[in-house]
Amino acid sequence: MNIAPNTYPQVMKGKKILYVHGFASSGASGTVKGLRMLLPATQIVAPDLPVRPAEAIELLLRVCEGEKPDLIIGSSMGGMYAEQLHGYPRILLNPAFQIADTLLSNNKMGRQEFYNPRQDGQRDFLVNKQLISEFREVSGQCFAQVDSKERSLVWGLFGDQDPLVHTHDLFASHYPQAVWFHGEHFMNDRVLLRAVLPVIRWIDNAQEHREPPIIYIALDDTLSDNKNGWRKWTGEELQAYEGRLHDLPGFFERLEPMASAVKAFYTLAEHYDVRVVSAYPPSNPQALAEKQRWVEQWLGVPAYGRLLFTNSKQLLYGDYLISAAQTAYLAADDDANFMGTWLHFGEDPYKTWDDVMEFFSRLGGQ
């Protein structure tokens, strides 16, 4: 794992994260190295886990008692273990709650080599029927202490292209914060930056009672390129919906982003509480679902739970609004009722997203 030069010394500053590694891995994994580079002011505790699951849980409970981590992150098998470390904020990455079945279905019986070096020098281990039985017993203890407090503490992140573990629905039946990200089973730089780090930042802000300034960004004509949406359709389809193109099924979902919009969104989300706001055409109720899918596809984890629908700008209470001056289904006189700073996207001096980012670069996160 080769993290870009981005580092975030203010995120989880002076705090402690316990990382619980996955099957056949160790505390020297690339994910651990990536976290340490991203969060240089944070102590990352990453013990090598015993192969026997009961021993692994016992070790983790001792580590929690001694280290008292501010956050626990568990990946795959480690996510299954981390779910059982109650009382701590936790992020479970592709958690292998059914690890016994996962090992069997992926031909993991027999001698297995560790992917990363371990402090004890052990290079391999044996997966036999006894170990499978032990995994089944320990994983069966997951979700045993789910209550309202636990539901607020635990996040689940699930790769939408994970070929190994498929536990999103199982997790979501117990915890509400189940989030898809674009990726596979194993972590890489992009997933750490765009999926894991945003959740770490939310948890850190909540712990510090930190409330960043709020930016509302309009979806239509600001993030998504509505004006050129017709280019995705045939002449016959366009003719059938002439004068009401926004009612065309799939219109909003197939829109392209504005140039540099996605990059700008991720950058702003590092410093602000960014919300996506969208109007909806009353004649096309399915547009809400289409816009939700667009946000999930293009903006991902940082936009989770941050999509708002309204046809009246005066209902928005925040610090900044980035929106085209004229957006379908939003009355022009609503604009004057926004109490914060309104950046008229598409007009001087904010004709492009590069212009918008120049404005915010001068503010330093204020």
Model-derived features with residue positions:
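C-terminal cap/substrate-recognition subdomain and adjoining C-terminal extension
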Residues: 270, 284-366
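Short histidine/acidic/glycine/proline-rich micro-motifs that form metal-
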Residues: 22-26, 50-51, 186, 251, ...
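Charged phosphate-binding loop/patch that engages nucleotide di/tri-phosphates or the phosphate backbone
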Residues: 178-214, 334-366
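Active-site neighborhood of HAD-like aspartate-dependent phosphohydrolases
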Residues: 209-253, 351
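Active-site catalytic motif of lipid deacylating hydrolases and related acyltransferases
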Residues: 11-66
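The alpha/beta-hydrolase serine catalytic core
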Residues: 89-204
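Gly/Ala-rich beta-loop-alpha elbow adjacent to hydrolase catalytic centers
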Residues: 73-83
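Short, acidic loop-to-helix structural element flanking the phosphoryl-transfer center
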Residues: 242-274, 286
